[in-house]
């Protein structure tokens, strides 16, 4: 009888342990497959494309690639003598028309005072018209001078924000044209994460929810908050023909690939450029609060590690 009870107890304990293990593994599997997470996430940052507003030869480059610069710091300089001469020419035109306008103003004033008793109405009107023409030319010359002054100022290209110089492709002696991108400036303290979540997991993603970010190849877990969810993505299976009619690609009803939607995550602490914009990471949305690691089971910890490195 004791042998039978002992055997039954061992069997019952084994069954209970198997059931508990199955439940733990099942919960870990559900946690792994159904909770909001993705390995398709990238660090991003605000990038300022810097292009000169004037054309000319580059006479000096003051920075090097990947250098951290401050707002207002000189990046490079474009040939200034040409624009200095243009400003001097414009200033000379302004001085000339100022003198001419003064002469024509005196002439028109004298004729208006004398009136039709001393000369014809046509001569008076002609003097007034000449004055207006000269005043117009003066205003135009002043505008040209101001533009020349602005062009001269813009031969010195400065950093509009604090950030890192990236992909510097200008060198002393090169000719650069107006509007051509010369430097990409990665704005400091603007890093965030774009996580491309499957549409099936968006129900567990809301602005304000907490998130964990694990950079690829790193054991460090960063904290962040869901900032926003994209309002729409492109429908790749629908286009329009040349007559505006909808064209829908054929697909298999039993094969439906979940669309990925960008989710923007704001980092709690800016990581400078330790993980540059464009590098990948794993993102897990933990809900309204951060995950309490002390409450995780062994299987959940395994599932979490699989997400990060699997």
From Swiss-Prot:
Gene Ontology MF annotations: transmembrane transporter activity
SUPFAM superfamilies noted in UniProt: HlyD-like secretion proteins
Cellular component aspect of the GO annotation: plasma membrane
Pfam families: CusB_dom_1 (PF00529), HlyD_D23 (PF16576)
Record keywords, A-Z: Cell inner membrane, Cell membrane, Membrane, Transmembrane, Transmembrane helix, Transport
Keyword Membrane attributed: yes
Inducing factors: Positively coregulated with aaeB and aaeX by AaeR.
Compartments in which it is found: Cell inner membrane
InterPro entries named among the record's database cross-references: CusB-like_dom_1 (IPR043602), CusB_D23 (IPR032317), MFP_Efflux_Pump (IPR050393), PHBA_efflux_pump_AaeA (IPR022871), RND_pump_MFP (IPR006143)
Similarity comment text for this entry: Belongs to the membrane fusion protein (MFP) (TC 8.A.1) family.
Name of the molecule in the record: p-hydroxybenzoic acid efflux pump subunit AaeA
Gene, per the UniProt record: aaeA
